[in-house]
Amino acid sequence: MAGTLPHAVFVETGVDAAGRAMAFAGELPGCAAVGDDPASAVAAVPARVTDFVGWLRAHGESLAEPVGNWYEVERAAAGERADGGRGRASFSLDELPPSADEFATWLGWAELAREELAAALDVQPTAAERLAWLAAQDAALASELGTPGPSDEAAAGLDRIYAARDALTTALFRAGPGGAGVRRALRLAIADDLRAVELISAR
């Protein structure tokens, strides 16, 4: 039955200092719900999917909302990077390279998410001080894809956020759809830009 189709959810635990969890909708890279624990994150996925699809449609994307139930299929914990930052989890789905069309589509989603963040920072530029983790993560993802991120002395605050994303975008284009880690990098770039917008708006 259409109403009982299963959809995969991938859960990452310990995504921040508070120990919260993120539940990622497997069919929609970058669509993720945050919860105080895995169960609450997974429970929030259906509503998040509706919001995510609506957001994309509002920006001209033609996208059908997945119908059915969402189930946790895999769980992994965030770790720690060599630079002391939070090393984000990888899932089995991340090993599947996107098609050329998917790659182009998801790059577009990442650009839309970054535009949302830029708009939020225009209103509250001092919020950039709370997003050092985002710049560090983009720089780390770029490095994993083979493109060095900005040096520690290169920029700070808002400038560093944009410099790190420029490095990640360059890395993604260089890697192309067949690059190892591309799906994971896009998933995190979209999800965490949108999460950053919510963190800014909550203040």
Segments predicted by a language model, with ranges:
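Hydrophobic, helix-prone linear segments
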Residues: 1-2, 118
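Short, charged, surface-exposed hinge/linker loops at domain edges
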Residues: 2-6, 50-103
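Short, contiguous alpha-helical
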Residues: 9-13, 17-34, 38, 42-57, ...
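Hydrophobic, well-structured mid-protein blocks that either form specific transmembrane helices
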Residues: 94-129
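Short, contiguous, pocket-lining structural segments
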Residues: 105-109, 160, 181, 185-188
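A short, structured beta-strand-centered segment in the mid-to-C-terminal lobe
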Residues: 153-164
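Catalytic cores of extracellular degradative/oxidative enzymes
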Residues: 163-180
